Amino acid sequence: MLMPKKNRIAIYELLFKEGVMVAKKDVHLAKHPELADKNVPNLHVMKAMQSLKSCGYVKEQFAWRHFYWYLTNEGIQYLRDFLHLPPEIVPATLRRQTRPETARPRPKGLEGERPARLARGEGDRDAYRRSAAPPGADKKAEAGAGAATEFQFRGGFGRGRGQQPQ
């Protein structure tokens, strides 16, 4: 598709910087949300990425009316040559994230052993298990409707309700 070179360069710069590109499948969208400051239409983004996909420079995924494009190694090299970038600059998807040390301090204890569990509910759990039924009790005799001698059946709601009880 014929498009201004500044739009193509803006698309390629964003793609190289992030390593991925997302676009809603809407050709009538006036501006791509991530390139709104440069007035790049969403159609230009979709067609530029379609071109890169046909050359094998990006992989495409589509889900829930959104396109997702991921740079391949060949695509990284192509964009480096196209944008005249040095090899030290890499997309964000290839950078290692620096993780700070964990916020929670680890418990001090023996290195080889796990720390003891908190006994918050263990006593309650054991008491419940012991008092639930004495050993040798008949569980089948305790199950069922109980000592009620008169049962009352009520009709359901909706179509099969039938007569009103009197």
From Swiss-Prot:
Residues 155-166 have a biased composition (Gly residues). Belongs to the eukaryotic ribosomal protein eS10 family. It comes from Ictalurus punctatus. Residues 98-129 have a biased composition (Basic and acidic residues). This is Small ribosomal subunit protein eS10. Component of the 40S ribosomal subunit. The ribosome is a large ribonucleoprotein complex responsible for the synthesis of proteins in the cell. Keywords: Cytoplasm, Nucleus, Ribonucleoprotein, Ribosomal protein. The gene is rps10. GO terms for cellular component: cytosolic small ribosomal subunit; nucleolus. Coiled coil: none annotated. The keyword Cytoplasm applies. Residues 95-166 are annotated as: Disordered. Gene3D superfamilies: Winged helix-like DNA-binding domain superfamily/Winged helix DNA-binding domain.
